[in-house]
Amino acid sequence: YINWLYFFHTWQMSGVYSEARSSLMEDAMKLLQESESRYKSHAIFCLYKAVSDGDDIIFEDRRIPFLRQQHRGSQSQPNICMSDFIKPAELGSEDYAGLFATTVDMGFVEDNSEDGYMGMLAQSLADRIAEATAELLHERVRKTHWGYAPNENLTPLELHRCAYQGIRPAVGYPSMPDLSINFIIN
């Protein structure tokens, strides 16, 4: 589930093969193999009844404000907001939305920070592992827990291209740029 393209992008090694890129991959694989039995990724998810109210989404007992897109695409298209994808409260019927959180054991980065390079390698791998954990969890939610795509059978490349039904927006990215949402969700 690891998207290696983004790993290399973090290291500004997108595109063509090079000795440095090959060496980085060897170091990453070695660190993963050495760490596999000592560290774990963790994930939690909740599926909630939800409705929208303006730019906010109300998850049962919690109101979360979302920002509308700040960059204007075209004059004919409105600036969208995450709340636009949830049924409005005034319709009188509920919709559903899920929240995910993923992380990697803190020791993974701390224990591998003996020098700058290893620390950066561990941090960039931890980011990719957390993202891969979210991808795996999202797949399980679609196929089993929520079950709206039980027969889905996507390749890793199709997963990375988001060829699945539904969306998996992430805090800090363009669809949800406000990092303070983390404190509300927590």
Put a short name on every predicted segment.
Residues 1-120, 124, 145, 154:
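Active-site loops and adjacent core secondary-structure elements that bind or stabilize anionic groups
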Residues 43-45, 49-54, 135, 139-186:
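Compositionally biased, low-complexity/repeat regions
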Residues 129:
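Carbohydrate-interacting regions of secretory-pathway proteins
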